[in-house]
């Protein structure tokens, strides 16, 4: 039994939810999100509460039940509060700059790495070594942050690289010289 799928989601104040056929639209003070869910799942809106009900007890339906409920919850939080990820760049000469609708990262390669900024995200650089990614779509914020981190993952030996602000890097000792 999917406990996640059985959650009752409360619609925040100043948030409008429209459900028609297998499509849900959530509008809030920060923007609007859309999601098309499976026909095996039924989404109900009553008295400012959203419930999801599955049509049968098959394994894939149970999986879709929990996933649909979690995505709708993320949509409700996204349009009312938004999501934010902070990234730190550590290393000598490592930095990032915004150039138009691209971010250019210098991370120890022979060339700078550029990534196109998604239109639905806001990217800020308070310092050249700090990046703040914010938006209403949790999946888009997380994916762009992961793509940035993938440019130069943090090294367990030196601690240099691109990492999330709250990320703890498990450090390793280097080799010791033999006598």
UniProtKB/Swiss-Prot annotation:
Ribosomal protein found in the keyword field: yes
Please name the InterPro entries in this protein's record. Ribosomal_uL6-like (IPR000702), Ribosomal_uL6-like_a/b-dom_sf (IPR036789), Ribosomal_uL6_a/b-dom (IPR020040), Ribosomal_uL6_bac-type (IPR019906)
* Gene Ontology terms: biological process: cytoplasmic translation
Keywords, comma-separated and alphabetical: Ribonucleoprotein, Ribosomal protein, RNA-binding, rRNA-binding
Q: Name one GO molecular function term.
A: rRNA binding
Which residues, if any, are the signal sequence?
none
What cellular component terms from Gene Ontology apply here?
ribonucleoprotein complex; ribosome
HAMAP family noted in UniProt: Ribosomal_uL6_B (MF_01365_B)
Similarity annotation:
Belongs to the universal ribosomal protein uL6 family.
The record ties this protein, via PANTHER family, to:
60S/50S RIBOSOMAL PROTEIN L6/L9 (PTHR11655), LARGE RIBOSOMAL SUBUNIT PROTEIN UL6M (PTHR11655:SF14)
Q: Which NCBIfam families match?
A: L6_bact
What is this protein's function?
This protein binds to the 23S rRNA, and is important in its secondary structure. It is located near the subunit interface in the base of the L7/L12 stalk, and near the tRNA binding site of the peptidyltransferase center.
The subunit structure is:
Part of the 50S ribosomal subunit.
Q: What is this protein called?
A: Large ribosomal subunit protein uL6
Q: Which gene encodes it?
A: rplF
């Amino acid at each position: 039994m999917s406990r996640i799928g059985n959650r009752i989601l409360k619609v925040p104040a100043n948030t409008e939810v429209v459900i028609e056929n297998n499509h849900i639209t959530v509008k809030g003070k920060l923007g609007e999100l859309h999601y098309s869910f499976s026909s095996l799942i039924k989404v109900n809106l009553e008295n400012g509460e959203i419930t999801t009900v599955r049509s049968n007890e098959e394994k894939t339906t149970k999986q879709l039940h929990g996933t649909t409920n979690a995505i709708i919850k993320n949509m409700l939080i996204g349009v009312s509060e938004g999501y934010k990820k902070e990234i730190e760049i550590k290393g000598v000469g490592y930095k990032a700059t915004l150039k138009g609708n691209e971010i250019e990262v210098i991370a120890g390669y022979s060339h700078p790495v550029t990534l196109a900024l998604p239109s639905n995200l806001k990217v800020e650089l308070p310092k050249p070594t700090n990046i703040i990614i914010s938006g209403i779509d949790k999946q888009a914020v997380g994916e762009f942050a992961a793509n940035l981190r993938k440019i130069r993952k943090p090294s367990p030996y030196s601690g240099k690289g691109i990492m999330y602000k709250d990320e703890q890097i498990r450090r390793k000792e280097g080799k010791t010289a033999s006598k």
